Amino acid sequence: MKKLSLFACLALLGAALLTAAHHESSPKAVASVHDLMEDVVKPNMDVLAAMKKRGGPQSEQDWKKSKSAASLIGEGAQLMLHPERVKDEAWTGGAEKSIEGAAAVMAAAEKQDTEAWMAGLTMTGQGCRTCHK
């Protein structure tokens, strides 16, 4: 009986370890880098660039829209760091800078701080220009 209990415990432990190992692996990339850039990052950068031309967000709705756009840019940049997408250190550095800039834009939008918003947007653009010269 003790051997059976020990065997059952070991079997459960093995199953738990296999399940944990499966969950720790990275999910597969679904969209291509081009799709992410064209469908997620670029349209949202266009929204922020248009606001920048007007001197920054001008209304409560603009501030909300800029926060939303920055969040999608930041998340898109996070997706660029997926192991199947990383090309080199410059790629990683550019994505990380874009994430940091997008987070700064979001924080500035929360405070409705135009100067900080512009600085965050500049940082986001610098991250993008790491690859897009």
Which residues fall in each region the model found?
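Sequence context surrounding c-type heme c attachment/ligation sites in exported
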Residues: 5, 19-133
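Bacterial N-terminal signal peptides
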Residues: 7-16
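N-terminal secretory signal peptides that target proteins for export/translocation
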Residues: 1-2
